[in-house]
């Protein structure tokens, strides 16, 4: 997908899919109705840290999960509910369905996609892989089910470095897709032989080093937290680099009282919940309005609203289906990731 067509697509979503603002009473009524439907349908709501705060709060209040994509996958896989409602973007719903083919997986909207997914079409990616058959194919979770089915491993940003180190120790050269910035970060961290696909996240690519330096001058005592999907020049300014869950832990453990945060502002809900005495400031992006494709908030994550969540439960709309022919091939690299991270957890527990 070209930069121009991607920009037009995102702006179309921003223009046409702006959610209706609910009154306080309407919001409370929707939350109560969603909670009742979840209970009646033996359903659980899982929400990503980048969703709007009202959705994250509802997931917590109803016994669901608010987490990064790795823990969303793990939670949906282990929870006994027969229906999983995934508030996030489409690849997260697909992942839940691949890992739980016997469960019903709903999403508030099927239009909530991801620029990384859009930028890695399976036909082009498969041809790229075929040109480099000697390489182990490692793909980021932010990809379609079809791309996952072409991979040897799936990773999230919270486990990517460890898995690539494991493969490097085995002497395996790697073909990486789709996020070029995360790929370069992993490459620098591990020294691995990695061939990178040319993709990027529209949210993180807009963070700018020069403006970040200027903001740091305004908050000289602030720590800078950066997601590794950001450009290298932004990562270089960070006091802590990591996945969403890792950045939240950094906010809890670093002694600073102020943080400049270079990731989607949806994460502020959990940071402020866990660190109410601390101040969190959005890192600067390319600007506002037409010049800014995301302005530190994913337009597709913003499509997960209370109204759409209630509608998907009442109407059964937004159900995720994955081609059964893809499932056995897509589940294999996902299970490898889950098994690897579970083993790593056990090793850490044993060393505690």
Swiss-Prot record:
Keywords attached to this entry: 4Fe-4S, Cytoplasm, Iron, Iron-sulfur, Metal-binding, Pyridine nucleotide biosynthesis, Transferase
UniProt keyword NAD present: no
Main location (coarse class): cytoplasm
InterPro entries (alphabetical): NadA (IPR003473), NadA_sf (IPR036094), Quinolinate_synth_A_type1 (IPR023513)
UniProt subcellular location: Cytoplasm
Binding of [4Fe-4S] cluster, residues: 114, 201, 298
Reaction it catalyzes: iminosuccinate + dihydroxyacetone phosphate = quinolinate + phosphate + 2 H2O + H(+)
Associated pathway: Cofactor biosynthesis; NAD(+) biosynthesis; quinolinate from iminoaspartate: step 1/1
Binding annotation for iminosuccinate: 48, 69, 140-142, 157, 227-229, 244
Keyword Hydrolase: no
Superkingdom, taxonomy of origin: Bacteria
GO cellular component, one term: cytosol
Cofactor: how bound: Binds 1 [4Fe-4S] cluster per subunit.
Pfam families, sorted: NadA
An example Gene Ontology molecular-function term: quinolinate synthetase A activity
UniProt-listed Enzyme Commission number(s): 2.5.1.72
Cofactor: [4Fe-4S] cluster
GO biological process entries: 'de novo' NAD biosynthetic process from L-aspartate
UniProt similarity note: Belongs to the quinolinate synthase family. Type 1 subfamily.
Function comment: Catalyzes the condensation of iminoaspartate with dihydroxyacetone phosphate to form quinolinate.
NCBIfam families (UniProt xref): nadA, PRK09375.1-1, PRK09375.1-2
Protein's name in the database: Quinolinate synthase
Species of the source: Pseudomonas paraeruginosa (strain DSM 24068 / PA7) (Pseudomonas aeruginosa (strain PA7))
């Amino acid at each position: 997908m070209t930069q121009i067509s991607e920009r037009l697509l995102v702006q179309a979503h921003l223009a046409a899919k702006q959610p209706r603002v609910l009154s306080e009473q309407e919001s409370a009524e929707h939350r109560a109705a969603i909670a009742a439907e979840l209970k009646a349908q033996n359903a659980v709501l899982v929400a990503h840290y980048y969703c709007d705060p009202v959705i994250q709060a509802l997931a917590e209040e109803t016994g669901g999960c608010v987490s990064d994509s790795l823990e969303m996958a793990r939670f949906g896989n282990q929870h006994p509910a027969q229906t999983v409602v995934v508030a996030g973007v489409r690849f997260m719903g697909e992942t839940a369905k691949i890992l739980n083919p016997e469960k019903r997986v709903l999403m508030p909207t099927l239009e909530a996609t991801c620029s990384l997914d859009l930028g890695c079409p399976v036909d082009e990616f498969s041809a790229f892989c075929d040109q480099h058959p000697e390489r182990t194919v490692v793909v980021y979770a932010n990809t379609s089910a079809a791309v996952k089915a072409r991979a040897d491993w799936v990773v999230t940003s919270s486990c990517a470095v460890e898995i690539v180190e494991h493969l490097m120790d085995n002497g395996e050269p790697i073909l990486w897709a789709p996020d070029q910035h995360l790929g370069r970060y992993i490459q620098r961290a591990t020294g691995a032989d990695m061939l990178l696909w040319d993709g990027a996240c529209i949210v993180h690519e807009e963070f700018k080093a020069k403006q970040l330096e200027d903001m740091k001058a305004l908050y000289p005592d602030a720590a800078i937290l950066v997601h590794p999907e950001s450009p290298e020049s932004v990562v270089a300014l960070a006091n802590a680099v990591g996945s969403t869950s890792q950045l939240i832990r950094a906010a809890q453990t670093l002694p600073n009282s102020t943080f400049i945060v270079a990731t989607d502002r949806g994460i502020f809900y959990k940071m402020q919940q866990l660190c109410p005495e601390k101040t969190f400031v959005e890192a600067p992006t390319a600007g506002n309005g037409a010049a800014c494709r995301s302005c530190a908030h994913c337009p597709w994550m913003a499509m997960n609203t209370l109204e759409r969540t209630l509608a998907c439960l009442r109407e059964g709309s937004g159900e995720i289906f994955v081609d059964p022919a893809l499932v056995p091939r897509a589940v294999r690299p996902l299970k490898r990731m889950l098994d690897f991270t579970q083993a790593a957890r056990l090793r850490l527990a044993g060393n505690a």
